[in-house]
Amino acid sequence: MQPRWAQGATMWLGVLLTLLLCSSLEGQENSFTINSVDMKSLPDWTVQNGKNLTLQCFADVSTTSHVKPQHQMLFYKDDVLFYNISSMKSTESYFIPEVRIYDSGTYKCTVIVNNKEKTTAEYQVLVEGVPSPRVTLDKKEAIQGGIVRVNCSVPEEKAPIHFTIEKLELNEKMVKLKREKNSRDQNFVILEFPVEEQDRVLSFRCQARIISGIHMQTSESTKSELVTVTESFSTPKFHISPTGMIMEGAQLHIKCTIQVTHLAQEFPEIIIQKDKAIVAHNRHGNKAVYSVMAMVEHSGNYTCKVESSRISKVSSIVVNITELFSKPELESSFTHLDQGERLNLSCSIPGAPPANFTIQKEDTIVSQTQDFTKIASKSDSGTYICTAGIDKVVKKSNTVQIVVCEMLSQPRISYDAQFEVIKGQTIEVRCESISGTLPISYQLLKTSKVLENSTKNSNDPAVFKDNPTEDVEYQCVADNCHSHAKMLSEVLRVKVIAPVDEVQISILSSKVVESGEDIVLQCAVNEGSGPITYKFYREKEGKPFYQMTSNATQAFWTKQKASKEQEGEYYCTAFNRANHASSVPRSKILTVRVILAPWKKGLIAVVIIGVIIALLIIAAKCYFLRKAKAKQMPVEMSRPAVPLLNSNNEKMSDPNMEANSHYGHNDDVRNHAMKPINDNKEPLNSDVQYTEVQVSSAESHKDLGKKDTETVYSEVRKAVPDAVESRYSRTEGSLDGT
């Protein structure tokens, strides 16, 4: 059995669950709406740097429940959530202590209630002013040529920050050096500034600039502490020995000294210059010395420079040297001599003081007196100089360049004759003189005209290039410094081979040739060097029917007493050794026709006409003979002759009927007809002649009843010999013979 307190606890637990369930059911039935949301900034949307800023978000929510709903408020800066809170209050705040430039931006607030949300408009927070930067230095004392490191920072702000640091001289407004740097990751920069020679007391000024949105915020300038500058070394000083007037021959000492401070880490370099030439220098001490025997050329301006990595100090002095004697002068009567002429050299000093003279050619002494004379040869060309000495002072004269010119030998001219020269081909003509002083000027003459010039400073031949198109003559002209006239070479004759060009074929007579006449074909070339090989071809024949080689520019082929066989198309080719075998020039096609001669045509016509006339005569003769024969054979046809006809198996037709009988044709039975005796014989191949005859019949025919006169036609046929002539007759008058 459970205790009583346990039973009571169980009861209250059930009541609590019931209330929670009812509350949950009631919440599901309530309705919510967000009327409006708003946002404010205290004290304002624009605030001074370092002040406090409070952002407030307001939410006006309506509900059917008597209990305010719980909602979320979200704070955004530049669309980035930075604060989120759940609350049943209508207002929530976000506090920003000591606002800075980086707090500037676009802010908004979003309220969410049961999956419903509403966002305020965007508000711009602008923080004005940049805190003054802090400036610190790595040292308060510096030496010339050293470095000062300046640290400029804005601890309150965030990067990026743009810093400007200026180097100032105390009590001077002008900025000696200005440097700028943009720090993207840190709110400070460290810059190095050199300490220069003119610097004494320095200070540094720093300024910071920060970009906020589209606005640039600039801080006030902050000055650093003062930096005292000390010299690392002093200005150099000159010491000249001997003092006073310095005469040539004395020993000259020029010394430059400095003082170096204890702060310097190393010695600077000391340099002594005469004009721009360095005459002495030292890197490991506080002085540099230049020692030399004094000569007048040592007079001039001397400069001493003391240089470290960043500092340079300079001082100058002028040194004058008194001349002991003037510079000697070397003279020559001629500087250009022909080989074999006399060379004269003379050395002198203005004022003619006694001195020791020496004349030298390059490094060789040729005379130890003032004068030098000899017959010039090629080896005497060179540079001569004279030296004059008094005590320890030795001076050199000016130099004299002597050129002894050797006469040129006759130039040789040649060309590469290994191959024949073809028209248009480039050839190299060489000109060379074996002996003679350089330089040598060469000229190449082509048919007595200057083609090209060349100057050679060596013994190599001059090479000229040309492209001859015909036989040509070359000559070489050589010249140098010698007074002799120009030298001419022998004449070089170059034979140029011209390739065959433009082959033409022609016939000397008309293209129409009468048979029996000669055909003469000409193959000619426009240009070409001999010997030239000519070949004559007939079209469609691979081999030439005639060929010849000649030095002439034309060749002929003759066919005597041409016939019809020579009719056709012809062409020719021509080439010489300058033509390539693959491209032999060829002529065009020439067509030749062969016709009969007029007298032959006349003879044939006469023969044909004679034959025709003979045939006509024979035909006429036969005709007249037959006609005469026919007239000489009258025949009288009478009745007693009828049996004869009947004996020949011929029948007579009705005398009252007219009948025409044709050879080889049988008329109607009613007609009178006569047939040959032998029907098996061939028909007569004679002409038919009709003869009118008078016939008297011996007896009357029993069937003839008429008694009138009729004309009897007799058909006479010419038969083979011994053939029977048939007669057809009709009688006139009475049939009884009266």
Curated annotation (Swiss-Prot):
Q: Which residues are glycosylated?
A: N52, N84, N151, N301, N320, N344, N356, N453, N551
Q: Which GO terms describe its cellular component?
A: cell-cell contact zone; cell-cell junction; cytosol; external side of plasma membrane; extracellular exosome; extracellular space; membrane raft; nucleolus
UniProt motif (ITIM motif 2) ranges: 711-716
Please give one Pfam family short name.
Ig_2
Q: How is it modified after translation?
A: Phosphorylated on Ser and Tyr residues after cellular activation by src kinases. Upon activation, phosphorylated on Ser-729 which probably initiates the dissociation of the membrane-interaction segment (residues 709-729) from the cell membrane allowing the sequential phosphorylation of Tyr-713 and Tyr-690. Constitutively phosphorylated on Ser-734 in resting platelets. Phosphorylated on tyrosine residues by FER and FES in response to FCER1 activation. In endothelial cells Fyn mediates mechanical-force (stretch or pull) induced tyrosine phosphorylation. Palmitoylation by ZDHHC21 is necessary for cell surface expression in endothelial cells and enrichment in membrane rafts.
Location of the region described as Disordered in the Swiss-Prot/TrEMBL record: 658-715
Locate the Ig-like C2-type domain: which residues? 35-121, 145-233, 236-315, 328-401, 424-493, 499-591
Cytoplasmic side, ranges: 621-738
- Give positions of region: Membrane-bound segment which detaches upon phosphorylation: 709-729
Q: Where is this motif: ITIM motif 1?
A: 688-693
List every position bearing Phosphotyrosine: Y690, Y713
- What outcome is documented for mutating I112E in this protein? Reduced homophilic cell adhesion
Function of this protein?
Cell adhesion molecule which is required for leukocyte transendothelial migration (TEM) under most inflammatory conditions. Tyr-690 plays a critical role in TEM and is required for efficient trafficking of PECAM1 to and from the lateral border recycling compartment (LBRC) and is also essential for the LBRC membrane to be targeted around migrating leukocytes. Trans-homophilic interaction may play a role in endothelial cell-cell adhesion via cell junctions. Heterophilic interaction with CD177 plays a role in transendothelial migration of neutrophils.
The domain comment in this protein's record states: The Ig-like C2-type domains 2 and 3 contribute to formation of the complex with BDKRB2 and in regulation of its activity.
Q: Report the protein name in the record.
A: Platelet endothelial cell adhesion molecule
What is the gene called? PECAM1
